[in-house]
Amino acid sequence: MIEGGFRLPRSCYGSGIVRPLALTLGEPAGIGPDLALAVWCRRGELDLPPFYIVADPEYLARRAGRLGLNVPLAAVTPSAAAPAFRSVLPVVPLELPVTAEPGRADRSSAPAAVASIRRAVGDVMAGAAAAVVTNPVAKNVLYHWGFAEPGHTEFLAKLVHEATGKMLRPVMMLWSPELAVVPVTIHLPLREIFNQLSSELIVETGRIVARDLCLRFGLAHPRLAIAGLNPHAGEEGTLGDEDRAIVAPAVAQLLAQGIDARGPLSADSMFHERARASYDAALCMYHDQALIPIKTLAFDHAVNVTLGLPFVRTSPDHGTAFDIAGTGRADPTSLIAALRLAARLAAAEHAVPLAAS
């Protein structure tokens, strides 16, 4: 299990000591703006690393007023954000005004949400920001606007490709002090998993996870637990042959490449406390196999981490929560964890070399 409690030394938070984190706007009508304002108000109490938000300052000011928060805002460049963080919430301004009302999905806000991501990624790749932390977006709003990528993770890879010409395969890891999980296949109907899952995909995912656990999480010898696809990992073929034909060969290949991997393991007995102590990350074959255990154990403080990118990206592990946007009831725990983890990972390894294609 990856040791939790990642907090940088207090001196790292001082003015000018570190590059700031770039926090995206997310879906403006969701809880992202609420959370950004709320966590800044608690920056001293929580000893947070400095960050700026890429957003429309006037929209943030209106949201702060709605929430009854006294948040001084300052339009800044990334280089001025860290020194300003103690006294104001630094905002790298967007040229796109936002008019969406809290709780009301509005496709007119999609350009600002996308532009915020683009700017944050550009800043971190230029060395102006230490890492990117993304607030949640509303995929249906983006899709209606014409957004072509399946989600945040794939869009980040596209932006890297546009900037560098390198094709990447980003990997989603959900991290908490209790458990780290990686879904090998992500947003697919169950019936499609059998068509998408392959030994090659499992091996590629395992290599990326092992590499980033070394380079960013500081684990000299990462231990991977590989879940089986079928109940009881197939019961020697009596409950499906995929675990013998696909998963087991992938585990053998990972072992041959010097990666500590075990499996296929029966998923129903992988996630209790004693089992979790035996590995650092669990590779799961499909979305719910990974997300159900971590959301059961760490619903409020799990963090989404994108592996395989040349920069650190984290995100709170929750959605836009339109039903409570603008009410002040949103829980900032996951965003706080995402900010802290981003700072810790960026301090450990700010730029990970891309694997040769």
Explain the meaning of each model-derived region.
Residues L174-V203:
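Ligand-binding beta-strand-loop-alpha-helix segment within the catalytic cores
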Residues L67-G68, V160-T164, L188, F217:
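A broad structural signal for alpha-helix termini and local helix breaks/kinks
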Residues K158-V171, W175-L179, L309-D323:
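Short, flexible loop segments at boundaries between secondary-structure elements
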Residues I2-G4, C12-E154, Q196-M285, Q289-V312, ...:
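Contiguous, glycine/small-aliphatic-enriched amphipathic segments in soluble metabolic enzymes
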